[in-house]
Amino acid sequence: MKRNEEKILLLAIVGTLETVKNGGITIDEAEKFMFSPHMISELKVKKCNEKIIDLITKGCELEDIASLLPERLGEVIDELKKEAIMIIKTYEEYNKTFWIEE
């Protein structure tokens, strides 16, 4: 998987988490977009950064946290966003004009 594709994926993870936290989508919907065993399998095949795969694996636990420890859900989402941002910081700045044209 290309580094810029991984960075875009990380940006999508942060956005998905923020949208769940603010009620824009449900955890169930976030699982369909991002946090699923299927996504993990696909990313492993594409040789995605293991840190991103680990992050998505943790995201797969959001439904359990919501049902067992609902008072911690916001905190866990914030922790996952911080982790994603820390990974983003390890990537070089994108300096081409438009990623969509690659």
Tell me what each language-model feature is:
Residues 1-102:
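Acidic, Ser/Pro/Thr-rich low-complexity regulatory regions
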